[in-house]
Structures are given as structure tokens and as C-alpha cells.
Amino acid sequence: MENKIQLSKDEIIMGFVASCVEDVADTLCVDYSEAYQRMDAVNMIEEYIIPNYEVLHSESRKNVTEGLIDTLKRWEESV
């Protein structure tokens, strides 16, 4: 008998958020913690990624990452 781990919707979304932070960090050639701190400073995770999860997770990884970087830079400029 095969035991499968069942993840909650929140766990799935948090996994997606983590992958977004990792991809932004890799693309910008910065540490994961720096990318997270920048995104957190403008509330991007709570105000953009989580509320738009359904749309974002259906996009290609490349488009999501490019969009996140563009959004991050615009939001940082407006602070």
C-alpha cells in the first residue's frame, strides 16, 4: 500500500511562493534571503503573489519570474 502525503492549499501556495523567491533570486544573481527581504519590504508576497496565485501558477515559470522582477522593481521605486 502506497502512502501519499496530502498537502493543504496553504502548503501548496507557500511552496509556490518559495519557488518564486528562489527564481527571482537566481535570475537577479542574489541570495534567496536578499530576494525575500526585498519582496517582503514592499509586501509583494502578501499583496501580489498569494492573492494572484491562481493566475500566476498557470503561467510559464519564465513569464512569472520576469513579471515578478518587473513588479518588484516598480514597487521598490514607489516606496
Model-derived features: positions:
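C-terminal alpha-helical interaction appendages
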Residues: 1-79
